[in-house]
Amino acid sequence: TDMLGKKITVDTKTGGNNNIIVGTKASLNSEIQKAVSSDLDQINEEGYIIKSININNKKHIIISGKKEIGVLYGVYSFIRLIQTNKSIEKLNITDSPKTNIRILNHWDNLDGTVERGYAGSSLWNWQKLPDFIDQRYIDYARANASIGINGTVLTNVNANALILTPQYLEKVEALANVFRPYGIKVYLTARFSAPIEIGGLKTADPKDADVANWWKSKAKEIYARIPDFGGFLVKANSEGQPGPQNYGRDHVDGANMLADAVAPFGGVIMWRAFVYSEHDANDRAKQAYAEFQPYDGKFRENVIVQVKNGAIDFQPREPFHPLFGAMPKTPLMMEFQITQEYLGFSTHLVFLPKLYQEVLESDTYQKGKGATVAKVIDGSLHKNKITGIAGVANIGSDLNWTGHPFAQANWYGFGRLAWNPYS
């Protein structure tokens, strides 16, 4: 009503002319199903169609998908057409996301502070959860769904094990319940030393049977509360964070142990490749390559290695990370930074999607010319089952969400490129 200046009539029955008919494939009547069947065959489980049809001399616009989430994405796409003054005559749109995991990484701490955050404090008011559900949680979910984001990591990669305790999992469950209708899965960061800090064990060695069993038990506990829990994001053996190397193990040992814990429930481990130490003799730019490339193909099927766009640390003009052209047997996901750590915080006006686009269009030459970074992360180059793209969020408690009002465009642009890295 606000957008068009007139009230729209909503009905559960199809009749009359010039209808917008919205629903899953299964909910459409047989006549309409037949008219859009070939279009629906072209989309995946999250995809949608927007199609103008004429049945019995009556015009309709059909917005449909195989699943409810696809229908929701289709509705947002249709609204975007209207908002941008595009024609809605003779529509014939079929669209599906190119990546499986399109996710925001919140570097939010449990005390309400946000590492590299320039838009106020954390959105998550842990003190009031699970009983008080802030309207902003719902608005956050709607905004993300409108640009195709389907996952959120609630906590900082410099992790706090307390998030895995029952007291906090109850709060996480409340957020998951809010986000679920909008197709957004909740993920958490896993502190590698959690078995010691909250589990009473004397070690966090990934080869220790008690440690592996502790993580399996913890995963079972989480999935009992949140059946669609996405999995864990892990920062290990970097900038002082604990990890498998503390016990003479490697990244594969750590990632695979956690992967085995969440695998029975369909969970994913996103293991970060951002590793460096001031005590390591290696050139920092080479360290991730040195620690990960030799293990190409050794990770479990439900592990995806999350690689920053550059080898140093989100530097404004650094080349794309060499790992994108060096691990053909391992799913890799992109990690972009939406928050402006190196680009003026929330003081400067910067449009980041052009930077993202440049990285995605860069050629790895992994299989000859045209083997772009986008083709690596969307799985089309190496036929990966798990694909993804992450963005370190620039969102906080500020009334305009992002501190600088223009920074909303970076959140928006990330979501659109996560859906389609070629757009």
Indicate residue ranges for each PLM-predicted region.
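Acidic, contiguous N-terminal accessory segments
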Residues: 1-58, 88-92
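Residues that flank catalytic or metal-binding motifs in active/ligand-binding sites
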Residues: 16, 46, 100, 301, ...
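An acidic- and aromatic-residue-enriched active-site/binding cleft used to recognize and process polar
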Residues: 25, 66-68, 109, 156-159, ...
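Short helix/loop capping segments that flank catalytic or ligand/cofactor-binding pockets
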Residues: 30-31, 71-74, 113-115, 313-316, ...
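Feature activates predominantly on carbohydrate-active enzymes
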Residues: 37-233, 263, 351-353
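Substrate-binding groove of N-acetylhexosamine-processing glycoside hydrolases
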Residues: 90, 224, 242, 249-423
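Hydrophobic faces of well-ordered beta-strands that scaffold small-molecule active sites
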Residues: 102-106, 152-154, 186-190, 232-234, ...
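Active-site-proximal beta-alpha loop/turn segments in soluble metabolic enzymes
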Residues: 196-205, 235-246, 274-284
